[in-house]
Amino acid sequence: MHRPALMRSALGVAMMTILVLTLTACGGGGSAREEKANKVHRIPEDAQTYEGEPLPAGPYATDEFTPAMSFDLAKGWTRGGTELPDIWDLRDIENDAFWVVFSNADEVYDPKGSKRVKIASPPEDMVGWLRSNPHLKTEEPEPTSVGDEKGVRFDALVSGAVETPLCPGCVDLPLFRYSDGESAGVEKGEKIRFIVVNDVKGETVTIFVESSPQGFEEFLPKAERVIDSVKWGGS
């Protein structure tokens, strides 16, 4: 029996064991990182906890909004209001006047014909209805697509406000009324990119990118990256 030979054998086994454990640990870490990167996030529901907090970058899917959809977020976004079947929205974390809104409202506000806006059913021609609003100075519409569904896009300046606001502190120009009784609209002086997708699983989806005229060209590409990543049907 040669002790040195036995020692080399034992050391060799020990080193192989350490190497296997190290590789296993590294492999496990990689899997964990991949799993974290591929995790599908949801828009947080708790407004008090998540108001103004950054949303993690990565893939997302809606829980409530109809039609269901998935999308990707980079860093720099925070949640807007509570996700509902007929609206969800995002806000630029560095500027609370920069928004992306996805809407499928069953009611709209008609600003024409009286001092006070009236609640009405959504129009069949959403593009025509928006462009006919006396407080929106709109550009010519262009064809576009979102999630492989055809739509129309056009830009607008908010040139005025309704004579009688819905409430003190409410938006200057209310457009949509939602299932929770709240309204969404735009403010006088803003620049808006409207995108209307007419038939997403039988639903009309109106997307609007909202910002100041000065910040529009800078914010629009960031908003478009979210919109361009949309896939209808969720995840």
Regions found by a protein language model. Give the residues of each.
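Short intrinsically disordered, low-complexity coil segments enriched in acidic
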Residues: 1-7, 116, 155
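N-terminal targeting sequences that direct proteins away from the cytosol to non-cytosolic compartments
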Residues: 2-107, 186-190, 196-235
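Conserved polar/disulfide-associated segments of primarily extracytoplasmic proteins
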Residues: 38-50, 82-204, 235
